[in-house]
A protein has these predicted regions:
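Conserved phosphate-binding elements of NTP-dependent enzyme cores
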Residues: 1-831
Length: 831
């Protein structure tokens, strides 16, 4: 079968559509925000592919994985196993890094375990194996009359009852063992929990340091080394000494443990720094740790949200000194992962090894180098392998997973991606497109939800969903190549591809007389740069990925403005409009966040029906007792656990999903009850409340930023990052202008926006500037860049080769700068 055939898809706003998607091709699904792109790509095609795979598993396996609901579609033929690479998957695990996610760190651990050269953690000299005589001499240096146990480790932190091991030791004539730190006699009944990890040390001898013990100690030492596989413990009342026949420093008397991959794992007790448990950070909670842990559990916040400092023991490297003392080409594993991907790639490309090490490392280095190359190919060469996953943007984490998938070299798979071009400069976009085509050429079907013009034009096939959003969307408007789409007059995408519609370059640029100076900025990769940020105009900060844009604006400028008194500049406050969720609970929605819900509740409370019943505004909230349905607690659905099947959510049979009780629903405004109003999309509500200025003003701005398709009561945790950002932008714009102006900072507000939505967004941003506010935007979108009054271009590259001011000026001035990638993209637009 050469295509995926979808018949009768009705998920969300899809209107019973049927479409054929060619297999083994790069297919772009596009359309305005809310038109139904994700509903088709993720909630229909991917969801069904995933469900069919899950269904093939045993019921025992399914109880751990959960079976997704069957999408509302009549039939899908030609599906392959599906993998979704979206931006919503954020890993808040503080142990997850770029290196661990891409598996590069696993190969590095193996490499250091096989060819790494151990050094003494104390003096730094290369270590060598100790003979029995050397170990004997070290023990005899203990003070006279020191009592000690000579122990041989026979079981190291392994699960099981270990009955056979204990029986063999008893049969060999030994009397005692130390199990999990406690002395036990071998002639007693020893029963160990099978499911727990245990450590067993054989007591070979008990001695006191004095003259005449050398011969006995030598015999016992040889026995201990034999049973302990070359390792022996000497336990005194004060400390435990470790000796090894394999790796030890003669000068310092320090023995190193076996060099295994686990030694370099900060997730293993064998390698993790004991002070910070492998996190590299210690939480600044001092004597209140237990209280903070209790508060974190009760109030549902992460312990990682607490103040933290670099671990004083490992200095943020996460590992024990023994692991950090193993080196390749004078670098330990922490120093390697702290390099940028690009620098790491160069390090291994120029690594000189002897013939033996080269043979051992050949396959490992091949895997490492291929993964580093894939990261460079998707424009992430500026990241370090030690970078925490939780600090990555949605676009970065998505491209990391994309690079990982290419590394796996799977074929016959259906990949579904959500705007992989987010966060990418035009210069990096070519690398991404080459990567997507490589994934396709491996024999995979690649479906991309995308708005980027370059990606759309590079697609083998385009599916345009629309024409509008919400109820006005959900239909296949056009399908074919970019050229074929551009000829369809009913297609908004076609309008912009053909040039029938376009975002015009402003005829004039605002000039500024005031600015915010930044001097000698040197954080992260910024190289002592000085720049002036204009006030009272629209400034766009540009540059390739990793050039230092976010560092300059979000980590230097924004904190500085928050601390400074801005009154002398006639500025009220500085506001960061980011893509963080607008609500932390499923009960948050667009109406509650913007304050529209308060006005709507007051409106219902003023109706005759409410006055007759004595209802106040609080009666019309599903968050408090009184007006909400108590059967479902105002959720509208009931959760039914199904054990090995996924939890089932059924509509509440009391309120029928309306969230309110019958008495509350009896109160109506213009023929609609409160549940009817909350289910209205913004555009419908705008018409419904046309005569209520307080509500209309807010809804009008939501419409202006392209959110007319979102229902007033839609749960905020279903919003994308771009939608959440535009809700915040609309909220700010709808607020009455104060006596003083504000500074607004935004990071890629065009995320998730179609050409037509970008046009609306630019109009809204220009309205903020027109009323006297300052707007600073970090952006790659050329339509936003060409609309700026002033551009600050960073670069010239990312990571270590970035962090410099390449150019400053108007778009026209920037377009003539020769060493600027942004200039190259602007030349055709600003003539």
């Amino acid at each position: 079968m050469d295509s995926i055939k979808i018949r009768g898809a009705r998920v969300h706003n899809l209107k019973n559509i049927s479409v054929e998607i060619p297999r083994d091709k790069l297919v772009v699904i596009t359309g305005v925000s809310g038109s139904g792109k994700s509903s088709l790509a993720f909630d229909t095609i991917y969801a069904e592919g995933q469900r069919r795979y899950m269904e093939s598993l045993s019921s025992y396996a399914r109880q751990f994985l959960g079976l997704p609901d069957k999408p509302d579609v009549e039939q899908i033929e030609g599906l392959s196993p599906a993998i979704a690479i979206n931006q919503k998957t954020t890993n808040n695990n503080p142990r997850s890094t770029v290196g661990t996610v891409t598996e590069i760190y696993d190969y590095l651990r193996l490499l250091f375990a096989r060819i790494g050269k151990p050094h003494c953690p104390k003096c730094g000299k290369p270590v060598q194996s100790q003979s029995v005589d050397q170990i004997l001499a070290q023990i005899l240096k203990l003070p006279n009359d020191t009592r000690f146990l000579l122990l041989a480790p026979v079981v190291k932190n392994r699960k099981g009852t270990h009955k056979d091991t204990l029986d063999k030791l008893s049969a060999a004539g030994f009397v005692r063992v130390k199990i999990d730190g406690k002395l036990r006699d071998l002639d007693e009944e020893i029963s160990l929990a099978k499911t727990k990890k245990h450590s067993i040390d054989l007591v070979v001898d008990r001695l006191i340091v004095r003259d005449g013990i050398r011969s006995r100690l030598a015999d016992s030492l040889e026995t201990a080394l034999k049973f302990g596989d070359g390792i022996v413990f000497v336990e005194t009342d004060e400390k435990t000494l470790t000796f090894s026949e394999k790796n030890s420093c003669v000068d310092c008397g320090i023995s190193l443990p076996d060099i295994t991959p686990q030694l370099f794992s900060f997730n293993s007790p064998k390698g993790a720094c004991p002070t910070c448990n492998g996190l590299g950070k210690v939480f600044d909670v001092r004597d209140f740790t237990t209280m903070y842990e209790w508060m974190a559990a009760v109030h549902d916040f992460k312990m990682t949200d607490l103040p933290e400092d670099a671990c004083p023991a490992c200095h943020g490297h996460r590992l024990k000194p023994e692991a950090l003392s193993v080196k390749i080409a004078d670098k330990n594993i922490a120093q390697v992962v702290d390099m940028s991907v690009d620098a790491c790639k160069n390090f291994f490309a120029t690594l000189e090894l002897d013939a033996t090490d080269k043979k051992i490392a050949a396959q490992i280095l091949k895997e490492i180098n291929s993964r580093l190359k894939f990261l460079c190919d998707v424009g992430l060469d500026y990241l370090s392998l030690s970078r925490k996953s939780s600090t990555l943007s949605g676009g970065e984490s998505q491209r990391i997973r994309l690079a990982t998938q290419i590394g796996s070299a799977l074929t016959g798979v259906l990949y579904v991606l959500d705007e992989p071009s987010i966060g990418l400069h035009q210069h990096d976009n070519q690398k991404l497109l080459a990567t997507l085509k490589k994934l396709r050429d491996l024999g995979n079907t690649v479906i991309v939800v995308e708005h980027d013009e370059e990606t759309i034009r590079a697609a083998d096939n385009i599916v345009d969903i629309g024409r509008g959003a919400g109820k006005s969307g959900g239909e296949v408007i056009a399908q074919g190549t970019a050229e074929e789409i551009s000829r369809v007059e009913n297609s908004l995408t076609g309008d912009y591809l053909s040039g029938r519609k376009k975002i015009l370059v402003p005829t004039t640029r605002r000039e500024f007389t005031r600015s915010l100076p930044i001097t000698d900025a040197c954080k992260n990769n910024l190289k002592n740069i000085s720049v002036k940020i204009p006030l009272d105009v629209l400034t766009v900060v540009t540059g390739v990925s990793g050039s230092g844009k976010s560092t300059l604006i979000e980590e230097i400028l924004y904190p500085k403005l928050r601390e400074d008194d801005l009154t002398p500049l006639a500025i009220d406050k500085v506001i960061m409009i980011d893509q963080d969720p607008i609500g932390r609970t499923p009960r948050s929605n667009i109406a509650t966040y913007t304050g529209v819900a308060d006005h709507i509740r007051k409106l219902f409370a003023e109706t005759n029906g409410a006055k007759m019943r004595g209802y106040k505004a609080g009666r019309f909230s599903f968050n408090v007792r009184g007006g909400r349905c108590e059967s479902c607690g105002g959720n509208g659905v009931l959760k039914i656990p199904m054990n090995f099947l996924p939890d089932v959510y059924v509509t509440c049979d009391v309120c029928k999903g309306t969230r309110f009780n019958a008495e509350t629903l009896d109160v109506k405004y213009k023929g609609a009850n409160i549940a009817d109003v909350l289910s209205m999309p913004v555009d419908e509500a705008l018409e419904f409340f046309a005569n209520v200025p307080t509500i209309k003003r807010m809804l009008q701005v939501l419409h202006d930023v392209g959110l007319g398709y979102i229902e007033l009561g839609q749960s905020a945790n279903t919003f994308s990052g771009g939608e959440a950002q535009r809700v915040k932008l609309a909220y700010e714009l709808a607020r009455p202008a104060g006596r003083l102006a504000n500074i607004y900072i935004m990071d890629e507000p065009t995320t998730g926006l179609h050409f037509d939505d970008v046009k609306k967004l630019i109009d809204v941003i220009q309205r903020l500037v027109e009323r006297g506010d300052t707007v600073i935007i970090i952006e790659h979108n050329l339509d936003v860049i060409k609309s700026a009054d002033y551009i600050i271009d960073l670069g010239p590259e990312g990571g270590e080769r970035g962090g410099e001011i390449v150019a400053c000026g108007t778009p026209e001035e920037i377009s003539h700068v020769e060493n600027s990638y942004t200039a190259q993209a602007l030349k055709a637009l600003c003539k």
